Amino acid sequence: MRKDERERDTPAMRSPPPPPPPATATAASPPESLRNGYVKSCVSPLRQDPPRSFFFHLCRFCNVEPPAASLRAGARLSLAALAAFVLAALLGAGPERWAAAATGLRTLLSACSLSLSPLFSIACAFFFLTCFLTRAQRGPDRGAGSWWLLALPACCYLGDFAAWQWWSWLRGEPAAAAAGRLCLVLSCVGLLTLAPRVRLRHGVLVLLFAGLVWWVSFSGLGALPPALRPLLSCLVGGAGCLLALGLDHFFHVRGASPPPRSASTADEKVPVIRPRRRSSCVSLGESAAGYYGSGKMFRRPSLPCISREQMILWDWDLKQWCKPHYQNSGGGNGVDLSVLNEARNMVSDLLIDPSLPPQVISSLRSISSLMGAFSGSCRPKINSFTPFPGFYPCSEVEDPVEKGDRKLHKGLSSKPSFPTAQLRRSSGASGLLTSEHHSRWDRSGGKRPYQELSVSSHGCHLNGPFSSNLMTIPKQRSSSVSLTHHAGLRRAGALPSPSLLNSSSHVPVSAGCLTNRSPVGFLDTSDFLTKPSVTLHRSLGSVSSAADFHQYLRNSDSSLCSSCGHQILKYVSTCEPDGTDHHNEKSGEEDSTVFSKERLNIVETQEEETVKEDCRELFLEGDDHLMEEAQQPNIDQEVLLDPMLVEDYDSLIEKMSNWNFQIFELVEKMGEKSGRILSQVMYTLFQDTGLLETFKIPTQEFMNYFRALENGYRDIPYHNRVHATDVLHAVWYLTTRPIPGLQQLHNNHETETKADSDARLSSGQIAYLSSKSCCIPDKSYGCLSSNIPALELMALYVAAAMHDYDHPGRTNAFLVATNAPQAVLYNDRSVLENHHAASAWNLYLSRPEYNFLLNLDHMEFKRFRFLVIEAILATDLKKHFDFLAEFNAKANDVNSNGIEWSSENDRLLVCQVCIKLADINGPAKDRDLHLRWTEGIVNEFYEQGDEEATLGLPISPFMDRSSPQLAKLQESFITHIVGPLCNSYDAAGLLPGQWIEAEEGDDTESDDDDDDDDDDDDDDDEELDSDDEETEDNLNPKPQRRKGRRRIFCQLMHHLTENHKIWKEIIEEEEKCKAEGNKLQVDNASLPQADEIQVIEEADEEEEQMFE
């Protein structure tokens, strides 16, 4: 380091370093302009297409470019002047001259009519030959060696003309004269080809060409005088050559090298901004001395790449907070190798452990390689006990959809992934890595708790004497388009929710330190150096315990990241220290160590309010209407809604509280307003569950979107808005009604619904919902809404409303067979389901007034969108048995621990099975509703069968109108699809129902019914329970025996069983009638013809008597 820099850094060593420079000053200084990821450059503009005219196509055919506009304008003026001159000459002549001219013209035309075609052919031949030879012989001086072609017509014809005039012997014998004249022509042409050094093959071509065109002139121009033939041939041939050379001279031939640009054309380049080249941390374009004194940095191409912006940020932060340690960097002092080797040894010990996940092992190997690279380089010596700060305002959680072959949201394993491991040490003697498994989404539904999404410098700080913090190299992730659109919609709407929810109660604490993992993605660090909206407030301080050092971040405001387009957070430290005591675990060596750590200070209230007001004005600028709506409570906006939503709320919610919701009666009652049934039911359910207040959903935007959504459903027999409303009602019923025997994890519904909506964002709380129209009778009942967070249930309800959006009334197989655009777009996989999800989200992102989720923060919206898409894709019946097998393995397998409500994967699986059951709930309704839904699906099937027959395709099963098989369709559907799904869902204890007292003989009757229906799983369990109870009573006799045991009555299973029984009876009757008809036909076929006729007559007489 230079002397002046050391002198400038001396005051910083005596006092705490100043706060980071403001972003405005940073952006104004010249050196800071190099800290972003882009550079200015210039590129040549794209060449505009030439005009598409007849002349353009002619030039393209001739392999030349058309002339410029100025040349074309000059040519037009010349032709106009020539036409005017000819017209004036004709008008100036008298009638006598006109008659003589007409006679001469007729004579000329009659003479030329026979010779015009040969002359034109000769001209074209010379034109194309000249074009070919000009292109073949083009050199650096373009066209300079091609003008000899103008003498080619003269050699072909003028020599023949001179011989005809001077040598009389050529006029004798025609054959001998023709041969002599041809030899003369070929001799002249051969001498001509020797002058410009023509290639041999080109010379031979010219000789053959000369002989051919001479023969055409000799044989085709018989109508002209002999002396005139060579002259006209030479004239038209010269014209063709001259035209070809002129085109080559004045116009640029395509494919030729462009002429050298003059100095003035350099200014025609367009200025652009392009991204810098991504390279490793040691190849940043600047010398190592500019960053780390005079130390030399060796490039290691095998290491992962760190962006230029990240390296600049790290170095800038070091210069601000670690300046006292730069004083010895000029002397070549680097990192303390003993500390680095100790850290490498610890990593090596961790790698020996075979129980570590593969992700952790790969990350530890990367860290070991990094430390090996650092040990061979000379760097400034950094205090080992000073936290190395890293900034992650735009951290992105891993999306399980993008994990390729990994199966995160399905399956029995829910192990967390470690995209980037950070060196952590325990204070114990073993020194092993302590990793905690966090499986709960803290309200926002992030992949990790928000302690793990906070700044990595507040992570695990080593308590040993050789502690040090190392840089991590996270994997760069691409930004999500959906989140970018969501952030864009927020700018047009109200201000988002001010903070994220952090739940410290769900984060286990290890013995030595809290386990933190680095987030997956880095923000473009130029945002921190150039933008005033991303300001870090820091001060140095010392704390005596590790608990005081642990602070997480809350989002006090939001802005947009310039590198990925996501909504980023402005960090303000407002969290409390963790309650776990860490200093009791310290060893004797650690007691003598004093840590100097960084802490984030709380920003003054006045400054924070000012920044919030500025951001609010930025988001709501130019949209006063949306700003007023966002500031008004939802209750004030009800005046904008349909009155039916408010007036008939009680009666509607009372009807919907029944599983057999008479939705078709509601459609008939609404009449003309039946097109709004989905939005009205959706609004009623959100009011009932309190989701509007919980997530601060603006009512007007909510109604705007769902009215537009229901308008997107087509008027088809089954997959219409009424079906979507029925599925929505089913998922609401299954998640809010009492379930016998379900254990509730959260019972404080009343407190949560009555509390202020901002309280849901405070630490340690997760929002749950409960239905206002339903109460839990006693502790023997539970509810799914008590075990699934409100955000996930809201995603389930929205997915139910979206799940068949823009359904065409055809199956996936039909779209694939007909090569529909959707099938091609989605590669024949879950075509309709992908189309429903994509179209519904595209509708949401299309207009700002549809953004009813504007108060969800970045992580909540990402989680919400993921859940909605997964729920919609789960409705694909092609994947039905995969989901069913996975659900049985999780919930009903003997070796399984059952559903873990703390696992987000298990909760997602339950929601997927729930919406699948709601989507095919028709057979589980009462008989009348079931028949109405059956009529709709059959009519839709018949329409597809008719179209298949029209297209010449094989008609799909059960879709042939000419051979209806309604009973077989429903019986097969219940037996193979609906029945197993309902049985598995019931066996898992998730179906709503009620406890009833079982009477004597119930078991026997239920056993008989189950034998008929092939559904005896429940009663087998009941028999096992009864056997266990009898054994227990025998071993421990009690003074009083209960008279009977309670059973669960489920309305859904009851209707399913009854409908299945009825369809089976119908099938048996049809088969019986069919067998009797076949038997009658066989008997009739065995009788004589007369007897057969007599039987038919008798039957007719009997029928006539019956009708009489």
Swiss-Prot record:
Q: What is its EC number?
A: 3.1.4.17
The residue ranges flagged as biased composition, category Acidic residues, are 999-1033
Q: Positions of the region Interaction with PIK3R6?
A: 421-445
The UniProt PTM text for this protein says: Phosphorylation at Ser-279 mediates insulin-induced activation of PDE3B.
Gene3D superfamilies of this UniProt entry? 3'5'-cyclic nucleotide phosphodiesterase, catalytic domain
Query: What GO biological process, any one, is recorded here?
Result: negative regulation of cAMP/PKA signal transduction
Q: What is the uppermost EC class here? A: hydrolase
The compartments listed are: Membrane
List, as start-end ranges, the regions of compositional bias called Pro residues.
Answer: 14-23
Query: What is this protein identified as?
Result: cGMP-inhibited 3',5'-cyclic phosphodiesterase 3B
Q: Name the source organism.
A: Rattus norvegicus (Rat)
Q: What gene is this protein a product of?
A: Pde3b
